Amino acid sequence: MFEPLLYFDERANLDYQSYLLKKPTYIKYLYKEFSKEEYQIDIIKIEFPFNEDQVNGFENDGTSSIYSYDNCSEIMTECFENSTTPFVFLSAGMKFNNFLNSLELAKSSKINLLGFLCGRSIWQDSIDIFCQSNHDNFMDWLNLKGRQRVKKLKNVLTDT
């Protein structure tokens, strides 16, 4: 499994808004490049071609959105429609509902998505319980809410 790294760096000659607008192009390039046979990559672990806080209808921190749901569907199709190497989406610490929405969007875009790799998006809401409550409450959260979240994500991939 191979994960190309893409992130905004303030040292680059690019402001954050411009980076966000170019991110789909970067993701498309990374996926296409590392799908080449010469790299012999079996699975690509890649992020969504848009940031969660930039999509209308997704939870954000008061930032203004630059993409509609339909824009994101088109972007997803453009980036991955001719996929040749299996790929999974990583959560990159997205809020759970945003990751779920992004995964649903990917599934509805009819791209050849293999699956997902998700960590923080599933359990990050349990940190306060871990820090401010007790072990039993934390384990209860993981066993109930955490498992429910994994099931929801899996259902997106298995439901047609």
Regions found by a protein language model. Give the residues of each.
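Structural preference for beta-strand elements that scaffold enzyme active sites
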Residues: 1, 40-45, 86-89, 113-117
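Active-site beta-loop-alpha junctions enriched in small/polar residues
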Residues: 3-9, 46-51, 89-96, 120-123
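Alpha/beta enzyme core
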Residues: 6-83, 102-108
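Conserved active-site and cofactor/substrate-binding residues in soluble primary-metabolism enzymes
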Residues: 25, 29, 70, 94-101, ...
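Structural signal for hydrophobic packing residues in well-ordered secondary-structure cores
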Residues: 38, 110, 154-157
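Glycine-rich phosphate-binding active-site loops on the catalytic face of alpha/beta enzymes
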Residues: 48-50, 111-128, 143
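Catalytic cores of alpha/beta
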Residues: 94-111, 125
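C-terminal helical cap(s) of enzyme catalytic domains, especially alpha/beta-barrels
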Residues: 123-160
